[in-house]
Amino acid sequence: MQDARRAGIAIVAMVRSSDNLTTRALRIIPDRLIVHNEIIQNEASSLYGMKAERITVVGIPHYDKYFRGPTVPRESFFRKIGLDPRKKLVIYFPICDYRMRENVVDRMVIETLANLDANVVVRFPPAESVTIAGLVKPPAMIFDRPGYVFDERIYGNRELTPEDDERLLHLLAYCDLVVAGPSTAAIDAALFDKPLLLVDFYPTTLAEAEKIYEYGTEHFSPILASGGARRAKSRDEFLSRLHEYLTHPELDHAGRARIVEEQCWRADGRSSQRVVAELLAALGHEGA
């Protein structure tokens, strides 16, 4: 972007995630900015002084394929990856080490979920560490570790494959509950109208600075305010919410719809087309 600016070449940039403008600094102001939703549009204006006419809201392009829905029937998919089609499915997206001074949560949650009479899939992040040292994987639980590894010697040197994303699509479509921390998994769950239980409890008493920090950030506050997710602050509350959601998945449907409306802007599967239209317009091909 710096080289382009010096060379007089127009710059079209895109904000890729909801936290990019508040937890990071936009060091170069592009000529045009593509964003997912009006929340990020307002951040670009209020925090960086960008004029509204230079910002285009398109929705979330990555979700376009999700509106197609699953291509493999539930029973076939479950059997293919080793799940019991007779039981419900819970997906756990780990907190990850970087969200805490010391990750004491992920192991505790996995051990708690292992006692459920349900299928449990732990969907690890492709490029972040999750400390569960010494944990023996429960026999009825699947550890899904997505990502193509480019270099085993360099942690995080990996990327999701189309097959990884296709598997996630099917897991989300067929699951009955999503358990997660303050991550984009919250939007994933809402998009598929799946109950979302947020983990915010700990095995020992911790100071606030040692807890999961992102619950207090600006980008996650709309999720908490939506009414579309429940935040468990004790193990008893966590277990109670688990069983409540598995029994009544319709709970908090309106709040999840609000998350989709605010975060996805247009849930119509055409976000990628809007990105292409913006790029063509920048090239002077309006209406192409």
Where on the chain are the PLM-derived regions?
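Conserved catalytic-core segment of nucleotide-activated headgroup transferases in glycan assembly
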Residues: 63-158, 232, 264-267, 271
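C-terminal alpha-helical cap of glycosyltransferases
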Residues: 268-288
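Acidic donor-binding loop of glycosyltransferase active sites
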Residues: 157-164, 169-183
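Hydrophobic beta-strand scaffold residues
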Residues: 9-11, 120, 196
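Catalytic binding pocket for nucleotide-activated donors in carbohydrate/polymer assembly enzymes
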Residues: 28-30, 50-52, 177, 184-266
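Active-site and donor-binding regions of nucleotide-sugar-utilizing enzymes
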Residues: 1-68, 96-99, 128-129, 167, ...
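Flexible glycine/serine/alanine-rich "lid" or loop that lines and gates the nucleotide-sugar donor pocket
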Residues: 6, 173-174, 191
